[in-house]
Amino acid sequence: MNAITKNSDLVVGYNVPAEIGMDANDVATPALIIDLDAFEKNVKLMGDFIKQKGIRHRAHAKTHKSADIALYQIEHGGACGVCCQKVSEAEAIVAGGVKDVLVSNQVVDLKKIERLAGLAKRARTIVCVDDMDNVNDLSAAAVKAGVTIECLVEIDCGAGRCGVQWGQPVVDLAKKIASSDGLTFSGIQAYQGAAQHVHDFEVRKGQIDAAVQQVTDTVAMLKAESLECDIVGGAGTGSYYFEGASGVYNEMQCGSYIFMDADYQRVLDKSGNFISEFENALFIWTSVMSKTKKDKAICDAGLKAQSVDSGLPVIFGRTDVEYIKCSDEHGVISDPDNILKLNDKLKLIPGHCDPTCNVYDWYVGIRNGKVECLWPVTARGLAF
């Protein structure tokens, strides 16, 4: 593994935020910290669900972009492999030791296709397709490299992004793949990404039910043409319990469940309660850097320390103070009772975990108030 498990020549506060054994209060801020107990519980919980349903979990590495975390999910959570969104991300994760990867996206640039074929020499490599000409390019690259690339036909099952319409367009593309040298038709990709953060349970369920019906009908049409789906993939943290019980999806692609974020705390279950089976495990560790006003404090985690596309962060475990505004390098904390002091530490739950992880080089694993491990964000910034 790539984790730093003992002190090294890295310089705390310059190129790494902490060292093994350090007290959490001494970690350089802002830092991305993981509550290891909560993280491990989340991984086990998803692993238990998958095992109970008799299906597979291909954990989505776009959340964490870390080879160490991917390997942990495989070893301790029963994941069969990982998803990545870009070729470069997949290359970094495979270089870190993962041997089964799905690029759950379209790869159409010829140079990137060439790299994808190179990846297939080192790991099981699967890619999504939604275009006949793209199949030709993938086939040519696979033949040239002497490899086999597995392909999933992507269905647009409601997200309005990539993918063909369900039914006959899927069958036509699957036939094209199956007859192309260097390629294998391995199934379908049907991820309803737009439903994951729909807060209302019945609305979310309705969107996934519609996707499940499209997938069920399409799988039947493929089977009628002797085209078997080894993978029927999709599902995310906000919907996995629907697809997992559908009887047609056999490979979940959840990512955020390991960390959770502030927006997922707004997603409701059937009873109208906030979904709480997974715990918050990811936090931005920040320090109060200025306290010149009685009713406000300024912390060192601003826009450059997080993504706020899904809203501002929530201060974990506190109701007396609130994160209310941010600029590039500063966060404004409402402190009506004048409680905070210089250098006080706060744990922020990011509004959106995935893009927040992409602005850090390191995860700092914390247990019992001490730094237990340092994991590099292996594929940080690899968006090609």
Enumerate the language-model features and the residues they cover:
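A charged N-terminal "starter" segment
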Residues: M1-G118, R380-F384
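Conserved, mostly hydrophobic/aromatic
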Residues: F39, K62, I93, V153, ...
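Active-site loop/helix belt of alpha/beta enzymes
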Residues: E150, D156-K270
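Glycine-rich tight-turn/loop motif centered on a GG-T
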Residues: D23-D35, D100-V103, G118-V127, H199-D209, ...
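Active-site-proximal beta-alpha core segment in soluble small-molecule metabolic enzymes
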Residues: H60-H197
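C-terminal accessory subdomain/extension
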Residues: K291-F384
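Flexible, glycine/charged-enriched surface loops at secondary-structure junctions
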Residues: R56, L222-I231, L342, C357-Y360
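Active-site loop ensemble at the mouth of alpha/beta enzyme cores that anchors a bound cofactor
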Residues: G206-Q207, S239-R318
